Amino acid sequence: MDAEQQTKTESAQPEIERREPPRLRKNVVTTIGARALYMITRVGIPPFVLARIGLEAYGLWTTIFLLVSYLGLSTLGISNVYIKYVAEYHARREYDKANTLLSTGLSITVPLCSALYAAIWLGWGWVAKLLHLPTSHAADGKEAVLIVVGIFLASISLNVFSDTLNGMQQIAANQYFWTAGFLAEFVLIVVLVGGGRGIRGLAEAYLARTVIEDGLKMWWAWRKLPWLHLSPRLARRAALKTVIHFGGLVQFQSLLTTMINSIERMLALLLVNVSAAGLMDFAKKWPQSFSSIPMAFFAAFLPAASHLEASSDAGTKQKNLSDFYLRGARYSNLCTAYFCSMMALWTYPILHVWLGAKMPMPGVLTMLFFAFSVSMQFHMLTGPGTSILRGMGMVWEEFYYSVPNLIFLAVTVPLSYLYFEAWTTLGIGVAVAAATICSACVLMVRVIFVLRVSAGAYVKQVLLPGCVPYASAALLAWPVWWTTVRLGRWTGAGVVLAAGALHGAIMMALLYGSALNAQEKQQVSRIPTLVGRWLQSARTAAQ
């Protein structure tokens, strides 16, 4: 970049942003709200779709996203590179380096994603065999795959704008645009699938969502970041080395993570059938959807950790990061436990009101739902550590989760075959859940060691408070089961919702009396006042 462009870049940054503190609280709160809404739409879609296209077609739809998740691994883990280094360059006001890095990344992803789409198009016969595409869905399945793969690969290139906003800690803005996209998708699914478009309708709704979301993020980035300047002429070999070095580690780790996160569907598809893959998706839908709320913490941890590491002096850096980890793990674990405790202890009532008479294989689905709910609790305990370590550039530490997971899978999956004397959906699901729990424990021990966190402090501040929601859910488990199975689907849904609210109140009371410190108790005591103010504001606005 020449001197004139550098001067222009530096002067374009508003003075108010030169000493702007991290927006961690706003980012977390906004992300939680957006993900809560997303969770509602994701939980609401499957019963509607299942009733109209059947389990086989639904299994094919989930398999399409299994394919695109692996295609997304081809981009050198570049999103994490963007977020980490934009956060660091922003902390040091080195915007010329940020533009160079972003331009270099864009110069890689555009041709690479174009080549991947061409390969999928030309090699369709091989792809159809890989997906076990049923003959009854040969035409609409091909159209859906090409639409989803095309827009997904285009979105990977355009993620440069979203990731730049995340690196600048403007995560709240990203969440607004993401919300607009998935709400539009939800409405279109109801219209298109309800109108008989089937899998094609699902693909078309996903296309509309991505165009809306990425278009808004691109517009906002150009509008709010005057220093942003992207051009192939800014690509540099030094930036390419940064992408390959850090991104390459993330890439390999992401390959293992994607394999682990999708292994139950992949094994069910290969060893049983496409309907088994669909059943796995149903069993994991609630745990995965509700996990998006505590994941709001993790999305903010990576740029915040990078900013904290870059702005802290050598004497306080370690303590700041370890304290940050304990606080983040404490609150994200409590959030996870609130949801997972209900899903683990109220399994059948939830499935009964969710799927109704259309529930496929109730006995197997109930046991899988329980197994994935428990394993999700352990899996989410790894999130704060991996996000902070990525923010510190220590991506290799994540191998303490993925490698043990693969080792445990190599043991538990064959054991499931020996126990059931056949490859079964239930056996595969339980084996995967057990491997997740064991490997999560390995990583938690490693993170405590690397960040120099006291094991006693971790148990006292993170693990023990996380047991309280399970005690609360257990108190209500029998009344919820007994009541729900005797009522209709919609009445039962009201019971589950009311029980969930009561569960939250009991959990908060138990935490207040046993686990919260003085500052946290003071914050909790302000909740009624804040709710009252919000209701008063809403009443005034309505008048």
Question: Residue spans of the language-model regions?
Answer:
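Membrane-proximal transmembrane or re-entrant/amphipathic helices at the cytosolic face
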Residues: 1-15, 448-460, 477-543
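N-terminal membrane topogenesis motif
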Residues: 1-43, 96-104, 138-143, 217, ...
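Interhelical loop/hinge segments that connect adjacent transmembrane helices in multipass membrane
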Residues: 2-24, 199, 203, 217-261, ...
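Signature of the first transmembrane helix
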Residues: 23-88, 104, 117-121, 151, ...
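Transmembrane helical elements of multi-pass membrane transporters/channels
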Residues: 26-43, 205-217, 221, 237-307, ...
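Membrane-interface helix-loop junctions in multi-pass transport and translocation proteins
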Residues: 50-52, 56-57, 172, 183-215, ...
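Helix-loop junctions and terminal segments of transmembrane helices
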Residues: 76-92, 167, 226, 283, ...
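Interfacial segments at transmembrane-helix termini and the short loops linking adjacent helices
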Residues: 124-148, 342-377, 451, 455, ...
